[in-house]
Regions:
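Long, charged amphipathic alpha-helices with heptad-repeat/coiled-coil character
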Residues: 36-54, 102-141
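Amphipathic, well-ordered alpha-helical segments in soluble domains
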Residues: 32-35, 39, 67, 97, ...
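Short, Lys/Arg-enriched N-terminal segments with co-localized hydrophobic residues
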Residues: 1-8
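Extended alpha-helical coiled-coil "stalk/arm" regions
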Residues: 46-95
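Short, charge-rich amphipathic alpha-helices with coiled-coil/heptad character
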Residues: 8-50
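Long, amphipathic, charge-rich alpha-helical segments that form helical bundles/coiled-coils
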Residues: 88-110
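Surface-exposed polar/charged interaction patches
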Residues: 35, 74-81, 97, 104, ...
Length: 144
């Protein structure tokens, strides 16, 4: 795990002169945080799904590649005839399955998983920023 330090903005809350303005901002921030919390939950679930799927797809792809190698060597020693034709058909089906799995690797593989993890980190930073904003506004409200 990597911990990232990020910049929290210094808000100009000293310009707030009325408690009502603080209340409006706090209400808005609550809604923002609720939206971000929901988004975080969605991204967490999606990230978990990508993690599971990426391992599953990689395993399936390795199995198909191994099976293709075996079928290739089997075809090479077979004489022409119906058994060889059947093996060639099986090879064609395996190549298509490999093609589909390679497409899934692009969609759900390690790169896609890392993109989802980055999305999750970004949402977590946005939530931290909203929390900092709320703390600044609440401190100003208390001072008014």
């Amino acid at each position: 795990n990597i911990t990232l330090n990020f910049y929290i903005m210094n808000y100009t809350v000293q310009n707030l002169t009325q408690v009502a303005d603080c209340d409006v901002l706090l209400s808005w921030a609550q809604k923002e945080k609720a939206d971000l919390t929901f988004r975080k939950l969605s991204v967490e679930r999606l990230t978990d799904r990508y993690a599971e799927t990426s391992v599953e797809v990689a395993t399936q792809l390795q199995g198909v590649i191994a099976e293709l190698a075996a079928v290739d060597s089997y075809i090479a020693i077979l004489p022409d005839g119906p058994i060889k034709d059947e093996a060639v058909d099986k090879k064609t089906r395996l190549e298509y399955k490999k093609f589909l799995l390679e497409g899934r690797v692009e969609s759900y593989g390690v790169v896609a998983l890392l993109e989802k993890q980055m999305d999750l980190g970004r949402v977590e930073q946005e939530i931290a920023e909203v929390d900092a904003f709320v703390a600044a506004v609440e401190a100003r409200k208390a001072a008014l």
